[in-house]
Amino acid sequence: MGRPRRKQRTFYFGKRRNWGRCLMAVVFGVILIVSSVKLISYGVDYYNAQQASASLREIYHAEEEPTAEATNTPAPVTPPTAATTAPPEAGPTATPPTRLQPVRYPGNFYANVSSRFQKVRRQNSDIIGWLTIDGLIDEAVVQRDNEYYLDRDYRGYHNVNGAIFLDETCDLDTRPYTLLLYGHNMKTGAMFGSLRNYENLTFYRNNPFITFDTAYEDGRYVIFAVATVSTTSGSWRYVDFTRLSSPVIADRTNAISALLSRSIYRTQVDVAADDQLLLLVTCVDDDMERRVVAARRIREDEDEATLEKLIRRTTKK
């Protein structure tokens, strides 16, 4: 007897190919829908953030009606009398201080909230300041734990743009020596997305000043460094933000030097350990790096016109 004939198999390549095409079409369709929903959500969040900021600006920038304030006549000061005891013997020369001492707000010894901030803090008591860079930023600054405002606007409503916030470790009971502000690097330019403009030398020369007013005092700052730094210890770009905020003069001096060495600009604006620093920090494409725009408070014996001329004349990339 001969072997039984094998049943010939029939392969339906065409049907399988059609199923594959249908599956790919479904996958691409789902991706398109999800992407569209995200884009719409981002657009809505951006619009809501802009509207919320605009309404708060109206409150913050509204002109205050002049009020009559009572004039306090200072009590007469009794001049010191000469000491009747023999002067103490001369001791060894005092060593220079190694730590910065707390400083009260000039003219606001008890840290009273200004009337301008009393108005905006009715919207949210977390509002502690207002940041202004002409033509770029005009936003409220809030403070709570560092996670809270990453995805919430200044009102506490969910928003992918987040809010500009002051580092949680910054104590405003006295004037801080370092103010660390964080904000998202939004592609729309919202929050700290516009800080990328400072990588253009011409822009920096034309916009070297920042206004940051807190609830307790106004502040005007001059930019001395623009850098992309690393948060990874051991990297040549590493800058320790903790040391920049340290009251230890040596630590602070070393951290300022490290920041200056990583700046893309070389400028003649000097920085001292006892200067009040303002650091605007945002993320970049690398998760372990940050863009930093660093400024110091303008000193009492300085004027903006002279500083601006100095920056335009001496700053190089």
Language model features: what each stretch is:
Residues M1-W19:
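N-terminal Lys/Arg-rich, disordered targeting/topogenic segments
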Residues K15, W19-C22, Y110, R262:
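Generic signal for short, ordered secondary-structure residues
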Residues W19-I33:
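Alpha-helical transmembrane segments
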Residues I31-K317:
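Solvent-exposed, non-transmembrane regions of membrane-associated and secreted proteins
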